[in-house]
Amino acid sequence: MRTILLTGPGGSGRTTLAAATALTAARDGTPTLVLSTDRTDTLGAALGIQTGPNPVSVPGTPHLTAWRPDAADRFRADLTAFQERATNVLDFLGASRLDPEELTPLPGAEELALLRAVRDAALSEAYGLLVVDLPPTPQALALLALPDELRRYLRRLLPAERQAARALRPVLGRLAGVPMPADWLYDAAARWDVELAAVTAVVQDPGTVVRLVAEPGPAGTDAVRAAITGAALRGLRTDTLIANRVLPEPSIDPWLASITAQQRKALEDWPQTYALPLHQVPHLGHDPRGTDDLAALRAPAVNAATTPIEWPVTDHLADDGVLVWHIPLPGAIRDDLDLVRRGDDLVLTVGPFRRIVPLPSALRRCTVAGAALREGELRIRFAPDPDLWPQTR
């Protein structure tokens, strides 16, 4: 299954372009599912139908299905199940139960529902293409990072090796005077890890790409640069830039002429700066509604499968005595970069984005000897640690 993740600045038309992209693929004969968690059903408005917690077929387009998962229902079900499993702990604390009717979803519930829907769609194997309407770029990249981060937290808080001491838990509990983590907690952690790994597999699959939607102009240019850099930091490949709401030229109106001049400059700069395909979507003069309007947008088709982004390590030991780790970060600015070595991990910060990356095995026996940003690539030099590096005789 191919997956297209659409994001961009708020108000750029992401949901509409997600619907148009899905429509284009479906009319080409690809079984397609388009996902969104927008509470106001912007997806349904664009498609001319009502979407909801169950997938619905789009009338007149046999291969197109739309789905807007209900975060509230799933949140109530999950929290109710958690209360049932944590009965002993809640009783010990004297806590009262929350009834499903009084539960309202917490911030972030929509995003978690979207991740779960992505996993379910991939496991169903019912579709050839999954189009995901993501939140605005900063939230979208944080959302895509969430499965890996949660798995890291689970491994730190509930390491699997602790399960070997199950027989000692009752004794430890009496000594400590508090209940020890029960088997169900470790079982739940293992189940969560499997679910999160399934989402990570979809995000990191070579068939998954990011498409950025932005209006051409100064604000759009800043948003595109940040989005491409942030996506690259997560190891995600951006396959297309979509310039939305492009105005026709020329215009005799001075106000419109000024806007079109700004758009023209951005449309000239983007392909040269990022070496990515640029697809222009015309302004229809009104908000697109229904499949006819979506077809008029002429959304780009699904591109051929791309190769995944690689972070190779090159050997310069013979010449310079170092190994070099190459991390592609297109659009990155030197002043926005920061990196910190913490044990076997590298904490890499680029502007507002941060990622904790495990070091390749060879680099764990080295010390950081320097770094440089050249041609959109961060090159980190590692010198072998004499105390850890194998000695040659």
Region annotations inferred by a language model:
Residues 39-42, 71-74, 136-139, 159, ...:
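Conserved nucleotide-binding/hydrolysis micro-motifs of P-loop NTPases
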